[in-house]
Each structure stands twice: as C-alpha cells, then as structure tokens.
C-alpha cells in the first residue's frame, strides 16, 4: 500500500522532539585500510534490548570511505563472521575481478580469511558497499553489513556541508532480534544512520549536500520533502544532465538506490521542514531541517550548480542496440546458485537494450553490475536525463533500459521482489567479451 504524503501530514509529524545528532560525514579511504566483518550489537530506536547484527568495523553503517576519482584504492577485507562473505562495490564501474560476486567474479571469503580489493574508481559520486544481496548473503545485508563510499569529483561542487543519510528497515521480533522472515502484521523499525532521525541545521544562505542512500533489501523508499526546496544533482552516483527539483517534492529510491540533493539555507526562523518516508501507510520522519539562529553565511544564496559531465556516452545509437527481453520472475539458477550459462553475451563496446517485463503482482527492483543504464521513455527513443544502476518496475509494467557494455567480464543481473517474500525473481549474469 502506498500512502499519499501531503505537506500538512508531514509537517504535523515534525512536532516530535528530535535530539541534536551528528550526521555521518565521509572519512578518507587510504591505501591499506581494513574492513572487518564481524558480529555486533545495535540499540535500535524503541528496542527493549540490543539487536544482534553483523557489521563492518563495529559500526552500522560501516566506515564512511572517501576516495578520489581515477586514484587507486586498496582495501583489505577480513571475514570474522561464521559464514562465507565478500564485498560488492555497489554502482562502481570497476574491474570485474573486484566486483565481489561469489562463484562469478571471485571465490567467497571463508571465515577467518581475507581478500584484497584494489580498484581505481572512474566515476565520482555516492556509492556503497555490502555483501552480494542474493541467496545466503542477503541476511548479512539485512543484519547491517554495509557502508558508504564517496568518490570525490575532480572539482567538487561548492557546498558548506556534505552529509549522508542511510535509510534502513529492521524486521524485529518480540525478543528484539532480526526475523528470518518479516511478520506481515507488524511494521519494521525505520532508521537513518541507525538512529530514529537526524537534525540538519542550516545557517542563512548555507548550502548543504545530502546524499540519500537506500540500504534496505526489499523496500522502495518513498520519500516526501516538505517545507524546503531541494535540487537533485546526482542519481546512483552520476551527475544528472541538468539539475532539477523533485517532482511534487517526492523521491522514490529503489533498494540500493542513491540520490544526491542540494539544499540552500533559505528557511525562515521558526519554520518546520523535513524529510519523511511512507512506511506501509504511515509517516516516519527521517530528518528535520532547522534554520539556525546565526548570522548569514554569505549575503545571498550560492548560484545554481554547474555539474561535470559523467564519463558516460552523450549519444546512444539505439538502432544498433542488441535487444534483450526478460520477464519476471526469471530465476535462471538453481536454488541460491548462479546459472551456468550467461543470459546473453556481447562484445565490448556493444549497446544493449534491456527490456524487463514485471509479470508479478509486486514491485521489482533490478540491479545491473559494472555498468550504468539510461531508462528509455515508453513511447519514443528519448531517455530520462540521468543514469542508474538499479531500476524499479511496477506490477504489470515493462521498462526498457539501455547501457553501453564497455566493461569486460561476467556481470550479475539481479532482481528482487520489493516486499515480504524477499524472493530473487531474477538471478542471472551476462558476459562482455
């Protein structure tokens, strides 16, 4: 069920008292950094007792890593869990051997063992890392094993604060522990940066960049922005063609999706503004924006941003594209394993038109590894003015995407039902030779 989040409803919810919280800020990812996956505990909002989790470096989210575009990164993964694991670098167009898919790009890392991930990010933007979100590894993601990687632009846009909001949901039983399967009659606990909510304080004429990350496994995060103006500058790590305002103040983030927005400090003192999420019919406040009682940071707001071009093709010759059709559900493997043969194989430099028909009664989210896609308009050869690595497809809908297969290797193509079933309704891979 989707509820309409109107401005009055959202602002009414902002009357709750929110603690002043320090938001997560990216830290430098240096060569030789260590990411250790291990059991942990988290005191969830409203929880009677700590929840057993899995986490990187004893925090949820894990360390906020920062890298530079076209500069090499080397990170050591240490597996101190009791199960196999790897790290998938979600959204990065990196070398195939570093993509972190067990049985396809590497062997799973055994308990007590480690693996060195070395890559050079070609794109700036907001990315994140986690185990591959399918089969036995999905439960690790749901237990909190994830973090955010920010890759800086060569010349980052001028902002005064650069903040990250990581959205997650937790299906918790009466004993305070994570359920193997959600209870349909109960609603999950929603967190942002593992807290109930965040407070964002804006000085007059201050500019803030908010990096929104949907770390849930099966929830489309339907967000409503009220009481302030925002501009979308990037989606799934890549700058949009031209910055634009959210349609009617709404942003839908599929599982794994990211959207970067900028907000200027033009709030009147005493006004109420915030970001809320639709949780299966009710409103959950994620962040409150507050006009700080300080002197203006500058005499006027900063001018509109001029964004760099992504390192992706400007033009796409659709008439030359290889057309691939997929109907969901379309599990190509057996059990939780990957299929032995690729869904399709193309030569490097080929254009792929991937049509995905959702024949199920529930929303689906499909994620492509190692590449970025354009979403085509349904009635012409135009496309949306941004690139994505994950696309949401409604029940009975067909979505066509197009991408340049310019990254050699074997790449996962993965789709999951956005609901309690947690089904892998698409588990396949394709090869670029």
Show the residue positions of the predicted features.
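N-terminal, post-signal-peptide metal-ligating segments of extracellular/periplasmic oxidoreductases
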Residues: 2-116, 151, 157-162, 174-209, ...
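Histidine- and aromatic-rich segments of cupredoxin/plastocyanin-like copper-binding domains
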Residues: 98-99, 107-110, 174-310, 378-389
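Short strand-edge motifs at loop-to-beta-strand transitions and within beta-strands
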Residues: 113-117, 259-261, 389, 397-401
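Hydrophobic or amphipathic alpha-helical targeting/insertion segments
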Residues: 121-151
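Asparagine-centered strand-capping/turn motif at beta-strand->loop junctions
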Residues: 77-81, 213-215, 356-360
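Active/binding-pocket-proximal capping segment
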Residues: 227-239, 359-386, 418-422, 429-433
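Extended terminal and domain-junction accessory segments
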Residues: 30-34, 142-172, 241-363, 404-410, ...
């Amino acid at each position: 069920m989707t509820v309409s989040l109107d401005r009055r409803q959202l602002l009414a919810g902002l009357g709750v008292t929110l603690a002043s919280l320090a938001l997560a800020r990216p830290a430098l990812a240096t060569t030789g950094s260590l990411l250790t996956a291990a059991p942990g505990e988290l005191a969830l909002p409203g929880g009677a007792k700590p929840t057993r989790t899995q986490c990187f470096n004893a925090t949820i989210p894990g360390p906020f890593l920062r890298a530079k575009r076209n500069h090499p990164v080397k990170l050591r993964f240490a597996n101190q869990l009791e199960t196999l694991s790897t790290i998938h670098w979600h959204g990065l167009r990196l070398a195939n051997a570093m993509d972190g898919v067990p049985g396809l790009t590497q062997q799973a890392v055994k308990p007590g063992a480690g693996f060195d991930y070395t890559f050079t990010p070609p794109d700036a933007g907001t990315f994140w890392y986690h185990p591959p979100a399918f089969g036995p590894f999905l439960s690790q993601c749901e237990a909190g094993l994830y973090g955010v990687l920010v890759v800086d632009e060569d010349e980052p846009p001028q902002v005064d604060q650069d903040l990250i909001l990581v959205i997650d949901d937790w299906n918790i039983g009466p004993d305070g522990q994570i359920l193997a399967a959600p209870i349909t009659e109960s609603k999950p606990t929603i967190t942002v940066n593992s807290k109930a909510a965040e407070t964002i304080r804006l000085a007059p004429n201050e500019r803030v960049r908010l990096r929104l990350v949907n770390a849930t496994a099966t929830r489309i995060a339907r967000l409503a922005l009220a009481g302030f103006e925002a501009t979308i500058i990037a989606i799934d790590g890549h700058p949009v063609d031209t910055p634009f305002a959210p349609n009617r103040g709404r942003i839908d983030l599929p599982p794994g999706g990211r959207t970067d927005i900028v907000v200027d400090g033009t709030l009147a003192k005493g006004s109420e503004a915030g970001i809320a999420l639709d949780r299966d019919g009710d409103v959950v406040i994620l962040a409150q924006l507050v006009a700080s009682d300080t002197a203006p940071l500058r005499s006027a707001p900063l001018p509109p941003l001029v964004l760099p071009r992504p390192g992706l093709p400007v033009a796409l010759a659709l008439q030359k594209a290889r057309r691939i059709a997929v109907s969901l559900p379309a599990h190509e493997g057996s059990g939780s394993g990957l299929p032995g043969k690729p869904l399709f194989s193309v030569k490097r430099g080929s254009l792929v038109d991937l049509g995905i028909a959702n024949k199920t009664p529930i929303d689906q989210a499909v994620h492509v590894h190692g590449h970025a896609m354009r979403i085509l308009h349904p009635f012409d050869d135009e496309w949306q003015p941004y690139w994505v690595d994950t696309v949401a497809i409604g029940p009975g809908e067909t979505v066509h995407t197009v991408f340049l297969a310019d990254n050699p290797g074997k790449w996962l193509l993965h789709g999951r039902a956005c609901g309690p079933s947690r089904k892998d309704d698409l588990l396949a891979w394709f090869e670029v030779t």
